């Protein structure tokens, strides 16, 4: 039995703006259960004596000198935009529905 309900999967799909059929909701509920089980198994194995890591090898940043250079004119950039308002790109609102 899945611990993920089709209602939960439908809510996640809605947040991601993905339309799913009822069959897909059922399928993804099962797939999410498999993923959650795998994460639970890893959590059981990882002990307090194992240090947390984000990369298997050490990483260092390679910085370049911050040199001022000419940039594009705002008008030129906005001229190629599909829509602009008040000197800025105008885009459709996507947040605030939930």
Swiss-Prot record:
EC id: 6.3.5.-
N-terminal signal peptide: none
UniProt cross-references to InterPro entries, sorted A to Z: Asp/Glu-ADT_sf_sub_c, GatC
Gene Ontology MF terms: asparaginyl-tRNA synthase (glutamine-hydrolyzing) activity; ATP binding; glutaminyl-tRNA synthase (glutamine-hydrolyzing) activity
Pfam families noted in UniProt: GatC
Entry-linked SUPFAM superfamilies: Glu-tRNAGln amidotransferase C subunit
Domain of life: Bacteria
Key words, A-Z: ATP-binding, Ligase, Nucleotide-binding, Protein biosynthesis
Catalytic activity: L-glutamyl-tRNA(Gln) + L-glutamine + ATP + H2O = L-glutaminyl-tRNA(Gln) + L-glutamate + ADP + phosphate + H(+); L-aspartyl-tRNA(Asn) + L-glutamine + ATP + H2O = L-asparaginyl-tRNA(Asn) + L-glutamate + ADP + phosphate + 2 H(+)
Enzyme class: ligase
Gene Ontology biological process terms from the UniProt entry: regulation of translational fidelity; translation
Entry function: Allows the formation of correctly charged Asn-tRNA(Asn) or Gln-tRNA(Gln) through the transamidation of misacylated Asp-tRNA(Asn) or Glu-tRNA(Gln) in organisms which lack either or both of asparaginyl-tRNA or glutaminyl-tRNA synthetases. The reaction takes place in the presence of glutamine and ATP through an activated phospho-Asp-tRNA(Asn) or phospho-Glu-tRNA(Gln).
Quaternary structure and interacting proteins, as annotated: Heterotrimer of A, B and C subunits.
HAMAP family reported in the protein's UniProt record: GatC (MF_00122)
Annotated NCBIfam families: gatC (TIGR00135)
Protein family (similarity comment): Belongs to the GatC family.
Protein name from the UniProt record: Aspartyl/glutamyl-tRNA(Asn/Gln) amidotransferase subunit C
Lineage: Bacteria, Bacillati, Actinomycetota, Actinomycetes, Micrococcales
Gene name as annotated: gatC
